[in-house]
């Protein structure tokens, strides 16, 4: 099959579905004369977005900054913690059941707590929440990568009388790297989601989440959807950045070999998300 | 096995005690009004208003929710949590059913898979939860009870992880087994029931775990937009009163924790049942 | 070379002028098989042997109606291959045992019977009978992953024979087993199939295996696969461990080996005799 034909096969069906979907939406709204405050037509969302673009963009920057800061700190904390857990078994035993429990709990409800402890007028509570959630995702995955080196590799290194630190450098860390990228691809969109869901729980009145709820509350639905579009774009951008980072860091590496260990999030990536496609 | 479970439970309790101790320790050591680093309020306030004592939190559970009434707050919070749990469970079941159905349809008609799958996958990178207020707005207009809308959003969020995982699982049957069913002249649907679905179960289980947490969060967030009185709503309203009644907020947090653990327990039980008689995955 | 094949109505399998080309008409067309004429009689044990890529597995799948030939016809039990498959006239076994990991051994054996619509009592009694036959009566309630490779293959064979089909198609079923287990399984297979007079078509790339098991060995050339030789192996109906050390056994092995080497010379393909074991 030629390359052109292959690309055609991949692009055309989703394009057709997309066009059909938007078209049907538009038609239904017009034919049934659905009130704009209920469900706006795609065309009106588009025009409102055009009018509002600078506001949406500003909100994207704010939420995006929160997500980015939280993501960076979360990755650093997660990685650091995973090393500590690997080194000190006592800490591992204590932290792991806690992590499992926290995995189950919707800790987003802690945002008001943070608002209380820190200043609710700054972005700190939101960034802290993102950091927390991202740390757990990264921690669970990287710890697994550091621990689960293939038995064959371990035997080989032992036969070379490698010291623990050499084993760390030569086997564990490279193994953990691919897990790190898996975690990153999950954590990036989760950071965005957490950032703006945090905004629903009060705090300063800016950002995408605030834009969505405030506009929805006063029935300016088309404007509200505009912020939704902004949120989708932001989430997609973060995910693509993570994929790009993975490709740049190690062109030959595929993080597709294993089951990701996931923290809670609103939208998770199943294994099929990696463009490389292959699975464990 | 029993001793391992007991040990884990004991360690969990120890871990909780450690966390509580750290909390109290910080209260003693930390600055009352917090502190700023590089202009950011990074060091939290340790006043009793901002960080109640752990025993105050526990004690608050037994005080009434609203002054003058008799019911202690733990009852109210339990009621909220149970309500949220039921909505999340309904959402999980509904979303799961649709997710499995869609996966089967996509497995049957490859054309549909090519058209829809990119969207299903992309939906997991974009924040669908942004639609919660919209759904609430639409729902507010129709006469259906509000909790159904909240459940629907949970279902919407649970739908995608399960659809993706199921589709992957349906394709994971061994080629030799598929040929075998072919050699028995078993049709597509019989092959689905006897081979592909059972083969898909190990892949579906992680998807179900994700869907469960997604549904819970979807429901909690939707409560805020719709005003349905579950544990999400409670944390928001208590949070708004945090300056006058700081410990109250933490009761809602405990409620949310209980809800999460209950859902987690349910999923673990389902996993154990679904995966009995299957070979254990080898772990290092 | 072979003697001319009489087409008789009692022939279990008749392959007539069959060719198989994949991606036919496109630039990447692959001619897997060309001009295959083969007649297998009821009760025969026929091995298909040849180097990797010679199309022996393809030929087996054509007989099984898992794929359709580009030209020519395949008759099984006097019917078209398709009708045979729909009537479930044969049992099949692969290199991977293909057992369902979520079913017990017993339920795995019952699978074809379920698909045939048998009642529960009838299924269970037949499954017990098959377990007895392959000497795994104690393992009926076990899960497949609890069994060794050889035992799993025995279950696969029991499953393939569960409905007592007249024809058994096997694609390198012992390929993944170690040598000792393999020899043992070969003896078991002869015992089981001999008792029921089952016709067997057996794909292998091991010369000793083909000679030990078969009444006839069909030699295929490298791609595009043609039948270059059919060697009669008259080691008798009763074969056991002593057979492996008989002079005739070695003589037949040499005959097959030379036929394979000769086949290599006849092909237009680039490769030599690869993928054939001398063990």
Where on the chain are the PLM-derived regions?
Chain A
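Periplasmic/extracellular loop-to-transmembrane helix junction in inner-membrane transport proteins
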Residues: 3, 31-75
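C-terminal transmembrane helix and the adjacent membrane-cytosol boundary/short C-terminal tail
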Residues: 89, 178, 225-280
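Generic hydrophobic transmembrane alpha-helix motif, especially the helices
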Residues: 100-137, 144-145
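Transmembrane alpha-helices
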Residues: 128-132, 165-198
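Short cytoplasmic-facing helical segments at TM-TM junctions of multi-pass membrane proteins
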Residues: 141-180, 209-212
């Amino acid at each position: 099959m030629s390359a052109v034909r292959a690309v055609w096969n991949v692009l055309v069906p989703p394009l057709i579905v997309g066009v059909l979907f938007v078209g049907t939406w538009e038609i239904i709204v017009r034919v049934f004369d659905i009130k704009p405050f209920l469900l706006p037509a795609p065309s009106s969302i588009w025009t409102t977005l055009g009018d509002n673009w600078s506001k949406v963009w500003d909100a994207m920057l704010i939420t995006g900054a929160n997500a980015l800061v939280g993501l960076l700190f979360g990755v650093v904390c997660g990685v650091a913690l995973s090393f500590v857990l690997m080194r000190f078994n006592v800490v591992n035993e204590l932290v792991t059941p806690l992590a499992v429990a926290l995995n189950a709990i919707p800790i987003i409800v802690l945002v008001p707590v943070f608002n209380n402890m820190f200043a609710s007028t700054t972005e700190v509570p939101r960034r802290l929440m993102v950091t927390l959630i991202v740390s757990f995702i990264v921690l669970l995955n990287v710890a697994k990568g550091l621990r689960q080196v293939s038995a064959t590799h371990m035997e080989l290194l032992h036969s070379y009388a490698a010291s623990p630190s050499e084993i760390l450098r030569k086997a564990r860390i490279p193994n953990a790297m691919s897990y790190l990228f898996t975690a990153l691809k999950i954590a990036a969109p989760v950071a965005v989601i957490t950032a703006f869901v945090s905004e629903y729980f009060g705090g300063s009145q800016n950002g995408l989440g605030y834009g969505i709820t405030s506009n929805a509350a006063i029935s300016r639905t088309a404007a509200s959807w505009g912020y939704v579009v902004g949120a989708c774009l932001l989430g997609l951008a973060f995910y693509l950045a993570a994929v790009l980072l993975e490709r740049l860091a190690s062109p030959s590496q595929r993080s597709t070999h294993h089951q990701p260990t996931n923290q809670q999030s609103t939208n998770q990536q199943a294994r099929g998300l990696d463009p490389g496609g292959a699975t464990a | 096995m029993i001793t391992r479970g007991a040990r884990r439970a004991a360690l969990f309790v120890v871990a909780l005690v450690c966390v509580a101790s750290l909390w109290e320790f910080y209260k003693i050591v930390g600055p009352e009004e917090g502190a700023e680093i590089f202009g950011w309020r990074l060091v939290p306030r340790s006043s009793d208003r901002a960080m109640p004592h752990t025993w105050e939190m526990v004690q608050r559970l037994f005080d009434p929710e609203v002054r003058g009434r008799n019911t202690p707050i733990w009852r109210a919070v339990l009621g909220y949590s149970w309500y949220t749990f039921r909505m999340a469970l309904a959402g999980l079941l509904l979303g799961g059913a649709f997710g499995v159905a869609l996966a089967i349809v996509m497995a049957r008609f490859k054309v549909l898979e090519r058209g829809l799958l990119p969207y299903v996958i992309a939906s997991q990178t974009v924040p669908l939860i942004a639609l919660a207020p919209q759904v609430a707005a639409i729902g507010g207009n129709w006469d259906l009870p509000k909790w159904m809308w909240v459940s629907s959003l949970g279902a919407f969020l649970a739908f995608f992880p399960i659809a993706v995982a199921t589709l992957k699982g349906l394709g994971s049957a061994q080629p030799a087994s598929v040929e075998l069913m072919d050699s028995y002249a078993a049709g597509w649907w019989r092959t689905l029931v006897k081979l592909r679905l059972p083969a898909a179960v190990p892949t579906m289980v992680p998807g179900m775990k994700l869907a469960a947490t997604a549904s819970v969060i979807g429901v909690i967030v939707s409560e805020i937009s719709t005003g349905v009185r579950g544990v999400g709503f409670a944390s928001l309203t208590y949070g708004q009163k945090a300056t006058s009644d700081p410990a109250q907020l933490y009761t809602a947090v405990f409620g949310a924790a209980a809800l999460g653990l209950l859902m987690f327990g349910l999923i673990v039980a389902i996993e154990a049942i679904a995966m009995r008689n299957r070979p254990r995955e080898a772990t290092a | 070379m072979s003697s001319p094949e009489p087409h008789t109505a009692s022939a279990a399998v008749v392959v007539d002028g069959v060719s198989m080309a994949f991606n036919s008409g496109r630039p990447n067309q692959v001619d897997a098989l060309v001009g295959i004429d083969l007649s297998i009689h009821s009760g025969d044990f026929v091995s298909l042997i040849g180097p990797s890529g010679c199309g022996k597995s393809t030929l087996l799948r054509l007989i099984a109606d898992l794929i359709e030939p580009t030209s020519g016809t395949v008759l099984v039990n006097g019917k078209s291959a398709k009708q045979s498959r729909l009537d479930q006239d044969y049992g099949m076994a692969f290199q991977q045992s293909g057992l369902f990991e979520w079913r017990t051994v017993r339920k795995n054996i019952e699978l074809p019977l379920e698909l045939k619509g048998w009642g529960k009592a009838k299924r269970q009694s037949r499954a017990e009978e098959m377990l007895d036959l392959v000497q795994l009566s104690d393992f009926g309630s076990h899960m497949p992953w609890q069994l060794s490779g050889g035992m799993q293959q025995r279950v696969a064979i029991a499953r393939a024979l569960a409905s007592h089909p007249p024809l058994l198609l096997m694609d390198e079923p012992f390929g993944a087993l170690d040598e000792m287990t393999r020899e043992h399984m070969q003896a078991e297979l002869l015992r089981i199939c001999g008792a029921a007079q089952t016709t067997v078509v057996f794909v292998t790339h091991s010369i000793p295996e083909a000679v030990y098991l078969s009444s006839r060995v069909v030699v295929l050339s490298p791609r595009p696969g043609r039948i270059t030789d059919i060697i009669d192996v008259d080691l008798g109906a009763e074969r056991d461990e002593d057979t492996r050390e008989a002079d005739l056994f070695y003589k037949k092995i040499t005959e097959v080996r030379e036929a394979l080497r000769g086949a290599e010379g006849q092909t237009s393909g680039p490769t030599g005799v690869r993928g054939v074991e001398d063990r």
